[in-house]
């Protein structure tokens, strides 16, 4: 009823929640991938995804247009899943707002504990390095109101830890994400 009336939402998903979340997200035309993302890094554990703003997100707000590219901001997303958009027409306009690098990031299908385990992309297991979407903005017009929904493939990105943590080597855009 809330969605049908045009209510706005910020939906935060996480690894291991696909079974619960995918039936709900399918009503919005979004799907969580089955396995979590891994990112190769000499400095951080493989479960830490450093997502960047997409070019498409620049049309949404000033911060995505100016701050994210100007300062090369990244949103730290520990334990993140990729999101995909269906081809079905649900009446929404879909804008990918956060994405991974094209190199060094893949959906890890073999290992589940990515905290400390070294992992590498295994093409024979169906793993592929490419750009993955980690957050979408959905919008649609309902009568005289615009409905807005943000869906993120990680809930920890807005936790107190990720909002305040400073890691060497990149500038955090986590706080910028929630104020946009």
Regions found by a protein language model. Name each.
Residues 1-180:
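Acidic, S/T/G-rich, low-cysteine, solvent-exposed domains in lumenal/extracellular/periplasmic regions
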């Amino acid at each position: 009823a809330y969605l049908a009336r045009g209510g706005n939402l910020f939906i935060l998903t996480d690894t291991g929640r696909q079974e619960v979340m995918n039936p709900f997200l399918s009503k919005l035309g979004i799907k969580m991938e089955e396995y979590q993302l891994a990112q190769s890094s000499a400095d951080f554990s493989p479960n830490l995804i450093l997502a960047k703003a997409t070019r498409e997100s620049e049309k949404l707000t000033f911060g995505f247009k100016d701050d994210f590219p100007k300062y090369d901001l990244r949103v730290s997303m520990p334990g993140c899943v990729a999101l995909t958009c269906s081809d079905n027409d649900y009446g929404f306009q879909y804008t990918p707002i956060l994405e991974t690098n094209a190199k060094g990031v893949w959906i890890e299908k073999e290992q589940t504990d990515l905290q400390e385990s070294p992992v590498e992309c295994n093409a024979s297991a169906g793993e592929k390095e490419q750009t993955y979407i980690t957050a979408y903005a959905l919008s649609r017009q309902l009568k005289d109101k615009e409905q807005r929904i943000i869906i993120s493939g990680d809930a920890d990105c807005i936790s107190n830890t990720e909002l305040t943590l400073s890691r060497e080597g990149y500038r955090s855009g986590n706080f910028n994400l929630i104020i946009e």
